[in-house]
Amino acid sequence: MPAWLMGQDVNLEMENGHLKVDSEFRTSEPGIYAIGDVAANIKLAHVAAAQGTYVVEKIAGVGHTIRLSVVPNGMFVKLPVVPSCIYTEPEIASVGLTREAASACSMKVSCGRYSMSGNGKSIITREQNGFIHLVFEEYSGTLIGAQIVCPRATDMISEMATAIANGLTAEQLMLAMRAHPTYSEGIGAAIENYFETKGEIKR
């Protein structure tokens, strides 16, 4: 840490090349907090922004609008739901667990999948490469993961992140009407596929 940034008398404890923080983002020096890349977190701007909001609310003494947690080793501070986006053509976005990750945790899941080749907006724009894959907990039907590859995937993933953060089920997600023609209609189609694979038809 550059001396000009904190002053000569500030000695912040380091861990594996990053500033060591506790579950409240406090460093070893009273009154000094650390967020984002310097604190060995997920290196995404929206993660650092959420952590910054958390710290400011704590300092101001107001209720937290964002829930944060620390993983068991105490090194990496993370959000319960972090969307990851890749800005390629088509775009790639993911949030929550994949089928494989859920299986590795011994979770039983059911999935819904939709190919964007049949999506009305994709046909209009001639961008039909891509898919939507949704992962639901087997018994409750709660959404626990989503992977989207298509135009506007990085925008569409926010709906999925909100659903996971609030514990929404496939039934609840089906209550939303999605405009036509939009890429987001593919989300509804993927949910319908989930019900079809379970032997249930929801339209």
Predicted features and spans:
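Active-site-proximal substrate-binding core of FAD-dependent oxidoreductases
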Residues: A40, K58-V95, A179
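A generic short alpha-helical patch detector that favors 3-5-residue windows
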Residues: E24-T27, G63, R67, R152, ...
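Short beta-strand-initiation
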Residues: N16, V70, N129-F131
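FAD-site-proximal beta/loop scaffold in flavoenzymes
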Residues: M1-G63
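Conserved protein kinase catalytic domain
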Residues: T53-V56, P72, P83, A161, ...
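Solvent-exposed alpha-helices and their adjacent loops that cap or buttress functional pockets
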Residues: R26-T27, G31, R67-L68, I124-E127, ...
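Beta-strand-connecting loop/turn residues
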Residues: G17, P30-G31, N73, Y139-G141
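Flexible, glycine-rich terminal cap/loop adjacent to redox cofactors
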Residues: F76, I86-R203
